Regions:
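Charged interaction patches that mediate protein-protein contacts
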Residues: 1, 156-165
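Conserved mixed alpha/beta catalytic, RNA-binding, or beta-rich assembly cores of soluble enzyme
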Residues: 25-104, 108-117, 122-146, 163-171
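Intrinsically disordered, low-complexity terminal tails and inter-domain linkers enriched
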Residues: 8-10, 14-15, 152-153, 159, ...
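Short, Lys/Arg-rich amphipathic alpha-helical interaction segments
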Residues: 141-157
């Protein structure tokens, strides 16, 4: 190697081909308590947009980075930071959602959350959290599935994830 040259090789130089990004949609629940969104998976991590209720919006953003647990290095934990817009409480949804995904998948995870239900009571909030939990389970199941099974729908307790693959650049005609 020449002096000053980097010893790091790109994926293509190492002879590997990068995994194509995957994008899919999810939803859980019904009516006012329904949550839905999209997940975008790349080699660098996972980005999830989670919205729902009467007024879908951006209320909070969480980023979670997986790391070894301080209590038991054989287990995975996550460090999570959250930014909530003034007057919004979606940080309570975005933080555990991002942390659960990062811990289970070992990927840096960003979650943008915005769920608003007009005149919501404690039961409404509990139902939204339950549906978000189902969404987490389905996303984890989808991404832990063997590659050959990823083109199939994944059902978790009657909850389905629809898969939409990001188009490959190969085979496209240039205009």
């Amino acid at each position: 190697m020449k002096p000053g040259a980097s010893s790091r090789r790109t994926i293509r130089e190492a002879g590997a081909t990068p995994q194509a990004p995957i994008q899919f949609e999810f939803d859980a629940g019904a009516g006012r308590h329904r949550v839905w969104g999209t997940a975008f998976v790349s080699q660098e991590g996972l980005a999830v947009n989670l919205v729902g209720g009467d007024v879908p919006h951006i209320g909070a953003v969480a980023i979670s980075i997986p790391r070894p647990s301080r209590a038991d290095a054989r287990r995975r934990s996550a460090t999570t930071s959250v930014f909530a817009l003034p007057g919004h409480k979606e940080d309570e949804l975005a933080r555990p959602f991002a942390a659960s995904l990062a811990q289970a998948l070992g990927r840096t995870t960003v979650v943008v959350a915005g769920v608003h239900i007009r005149r919501a009571g404690p039961a409404d909030i509990a139902k939204v959290f339950e549906n978000a939990g189902r969404a987490v389970e389905a996303i984890i199941a989808r991404l832990k599935a063997p590659p050959r099974d990823r083109d199939w729908r994944v059902a978790v307790d009657g909850f389905a994830v629809s898969v939409v693959r990001t188009p490959s650049r190969r085979g496209r005609k240039r205009s």
